[in-house]
A protein has these predicted regions:
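C-terminal-biased regions
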Residues: 1-69
Length: 69
């Protein structure tokens, strides 16, 4: 399972690529989440949405795809 620290790291990559809203969404992914399963589903959804953003650099995209798998 992805750690909070890793999510923060990915969010910083996304923010550096200019996708501030997506980075904020990743940083606050734990808000209102009550279980590990719910958190995992929410993060998977957010990572998928992030991958669709065309502003991401190749290195950011690769880092996110690694977590996606």
């Amino acid at each position: 399972m992805i750690t909070v620290e890793r999510v923060a790291e990915l969010a910083s990559y996304v923010r550096a690529d200019g996708a501030d809203q997506l980075a904020s969404d990743l940083e606050t992914a734990d808000a209102g989440v009550f279980s590990g399963t719910e958190r995992a589903m929410k993060l998977r959804f957010l990572l998928a949405a992030t991958l669709r953003d065309e502003r991401l650099s190749a290195s950011t995209r690769t880092a996110i795809q690694t977590e996606w798998q």
